[in-house]
Amino acid sequence: MKQAWNGWLLALQLFTTIPIRRSIAWNAAHVRWLVRCMPLAGALIGALSAGVYALFSTFSFSSPLVWALLLLWLGIWMAGGMHADGFMDVSDAFFSYRDVKRRQEIMSDPRVGAFAVLSLICLLSFRWLFLYESLQTGIPPALFAAVPLLSRAGAAWLLSVGKLAKPTGMAASLREYSSWRDAIWALGLAFVLLSLLCASTAISVQTGAALAAAAVVLAAAAKPWAEKQFGGITGDVLGALIEGGETVLWGVIWLLHSSVMG
């Protein structure tokens, strides 16, 4: 139990800006639980956003346009911008149209290129649009927890099954002490939490199933794509999957609710 708790705290330290003032050893037991808790860390970020949305959406002066922007940036800030940085690095490398070795070098370069900036603007613009349109339909706050829950569950799976692009870096550090069993744990925890949200009617079963299916397709497609384009997975690739996945999942929510409203 202590190892699980330390792994949970380590996940919060690494993947969120929640202040955990405690030194936790980076060892096999803690890292295994860190990987298992990745979806839960995402769900916590989403739950905080859901709480903010539920609290302030009751005010008559609330505007979907403003709230879409605030909730968008709240989610990115709570994740420390870590995954957005990975998305930018992957975009720079992919749009360089160079060979695999050069793309790996570009992802390791701390400098930011034009394609990274343009790609992030495009990504966040579409997410803001999907959020704005969805908020106007009166979506349940629980969806803010479901989206980051599923995006990080997909990243945990990709971490366990994908070929490593290099023996160093964040993905290699996590993979050193974890295995596919830990990914099964992560997927199981995500499934249980999503099922509870559906059972409590916080999210409809149809919406939950559609989001889960979309997350599965994204993670499954990311594996061969990353191995072809970058020689395997890296921490940046995992971050790109999380950020890109959240935008796609919000697009699915928008399509589902716009079709119902229509």
Swiss-Prot record:
<keyword id="KW-1133">Transmembrane helix</keyword>
<feature type="transmembrane region" description="Helical">
    <location>
        <begin position="205"/>
        <end position="225"/>
    </location>
</feature>
<feature type="transmembrane region" description="Helical">
    <location>
        <begin position="183"/>
        <end position="203"/>
    </location>
</feature>
<protein>
    <recommendedName>
        <fullName>Adenosylcobinamide-GDP ribazoletransferase</fullName>
        <ecNumber>2.7.8.26</ecNumber>
    </recommendedName>
</protein>
<dbReference type="GO" id="GO:0005886">
    <property type="term" value="C:plasma membrane"/>
</dbReference>
<comment type="similarity">
    <text>Belongs to the CobS family.</text>
</comment>
<keyword id="KW-0808">Transferase</keyword>
<dbReference type="InterPro" id="IPR003805">
    <property type="entry name" value="CobS"/>
</dbReference>
<keyword id="KW-0472">Membrane</keyword>
<comment type="function">
    <text>Joins adenosylcobinamide-GDP and alpha-ribazole to generate adenosylcobalamin (Ado-cobalamin). Also synthesizes adenosylcobalamin 5'-phosphate from adenosylcobinamide-GDP and alpha-ribazole 5'-phosphate.</text>
</comment>
<dbReference type="GO" id="GO:0009236">
    <property type="term" value="P:cobalamin biosynthetic process"/>
</dbReference>
<feature type="transmembrane region" description="Helical">
    <location>
        <begin position="37"/>
        <end position="57"/>
    </location>
</feature>
<feature type="transmembrane region" description="Helical">
    <location>
        <begin position="139"/>
        <end position="159"/>
    </location>
</feature>
<feature type="transmembrane region" description="Helical">
    <location>
        <begin position="4"/>
        <end position="26"/>
    </location>
</feature>
<dbReference type="Pfam" id="PF02654">
    <property type="entry name" value="CobS"/>
</dbReference>
<keyword id="KW-0169">Cobalamin biosynthesis</keyword>
<keyword id="KW-0460">Magnesium</keyword>
<feature type="transmembrane region" description="Helical">
    <location>
        <begin position="237"/>
        <end position="257"/>
    </location>
</feature>
<comment type="pathway">
    <text>Cofactor biosynthesis; adenosylcobalamin biosynthesis; adenosylcobalamin from cob(II)yrinate a,c-diamide: step 7/7.</text>
</comment>
<dbReference type="GO" id="GO:0008818">
    <property type="term" value="F:cobalamin 5'-phosphate synthase activity"/>
</dbReference>
<feature type="transmembrane region" description="Helical">
    <location>
        <begin position="59"/>
        <end position="79"/>
    </location>
</feature>
<dbReference type="GO" id="GO:0051073">
    <property type="term" value="F:adenosylcobinamide-GDP ribazoletransferase activity"/>
</dbReference>
<keyword id="KW-1003">Cell membrane</keyword>
<feature type="transmembrane region" description="Helical">
    <location>
        <begin position="112"/>
        <end position="132"/>
    </location>
</feature>
<keyword id="KW-0812">Transmembrane</keyword>
